Amino acid sequence: MTASLNIAPDIKISVNQTFGIESDMEVDAFSKKSEFVPEIDKDYIFDKDTTIAILSGFNFNKRVMVQGFHGTGKSTHITQIAARLNWPCVRVNLDSHISRIDLMGKDSIVMKDQKQITEFKEGILPWSIQNPVALIFDEYDAMRPDVAFLLTKVLEAEGGLTLLEKNKVIKPNNYFRLFATANTIGLGDTTGLYTGTQQINQAQLDRWNIVTTLNY
C-alpha cells in the first residue's frame, strides 16, 4: 500500500446543509480532498435513517453495518457520505476467495543492497487501521470463517490488530472507521436469492454497534 496519510479532520459540517436532512447534528470532516476520497455524485439522494446511522459511525467511531436487498445502494450510500466529508475510503469485497493472507499481508521477495531477501508486506487491513480511512467490507455475509475470526478484535472500538508475522500489535488510528454491507445480516439465506452467503457467529454480530436497513 501507499505511505501513511498524515491528515486528520479539521472542520465541522452541518448535516442539514450538506445532506438535506433535518438535523442539528454537526460532524467531523476534512477541509481538503486527499487520496482515496470518492468522487461526489451531486444527484445522489440520501435516505434519512441510513444517513444518520452512517454519520454516527463517522462521528462517534461506531461500527456500522448496512443491510438490504441487492441494488439498493448500500455501499454507495457510505461512499457518497465519505465523499462529502472528504474522508479517505477503501472498499474490500469479501467474497469467498478473500483469505486472511489477502487482508493481513504476506512475504514477498524484494531487492535490498543488491540481494534478494524475503520481506513481509502488510496488506490492506493493517494499512487501513493505521490511517484515517473508512474501510468498507462489501458482501460481509459471504466471507470465509477464518476471515470472520480475524475481524472480531478489530470490531471493538479500541481493538488493536496483532500482526503475528512481525510480532507487532497495531493500534488503530483515531480516525479509522469500519463499515460493512450485507444482504442477510449473517443469518443465512432462506430465500434462495443470495447463494454463497454464510451464517455469521453471533458473538461477532454483536460487536457491530449499529445495524441499519436500506431497501427499495
Labelled PLM ranges:
Residues M1-Y216:
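AAA+ P-loop NTPase catalytic core and its hallmark functional loops
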